[in-house]
């Protein structure tokens, strides 16, 4: 739903446009949504149960949500997650009531030291344990900066190697991985099974730039451990984001490699 943020990205826009926009997405062939607006126990300004009902009324399912409460400098220094974990309690409850399968942390800045990165990993493990206890799974969404090094270690690699696979999966954004000058498929092979969800994304509409090898990515879903994928269109080539979304999903629906991957 981040892709259509200009139409339904806050409570006011959601109230005004959600029925039309969600139905249009469903009619294009989208089957599930990933939310990107949580606050104070609500999604897009409505109760979790109402959000679930809205999505299902359009003919789709609620799958995942981008949400986080990052550690502040004092918490990072003290390694005291008490207040942060209290915040997660309400958040987890709301997402469970909304019928979510996955909760995904969308961002973490590059820390200055490996010690700080280890603290972040420890924090994510604790949050993930809470999420798992509620019957959902916690993920981390990578951009390009995670492929930078922290004290000689690639941030993405360190996070994968120092988080518990029972409590944290990784949602690779294949476009940002390419922008970070790495191969998504190489990561699937290096860390098989850790990429439960993927963001299928391009520079604009899917398949236009030629930057991303979508055929190899879809044909290695099993190696990645992917159980689902989210089409994201951060910027369309025209002002009409829904037109761009339709062009993108049509590309995916008509691609032979996508059909082959689902016929395995």
Where are these regions (language model features)?
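Histidine-acidic metal/acid-base catalytic patches
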Residues: 1-3, 8-12, 17-29, 151-172, ...
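Acidic (Asp/Glu)-rich catalytic clusters
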Residues: 22-27, 43-64, 87-99, 122-133, ...
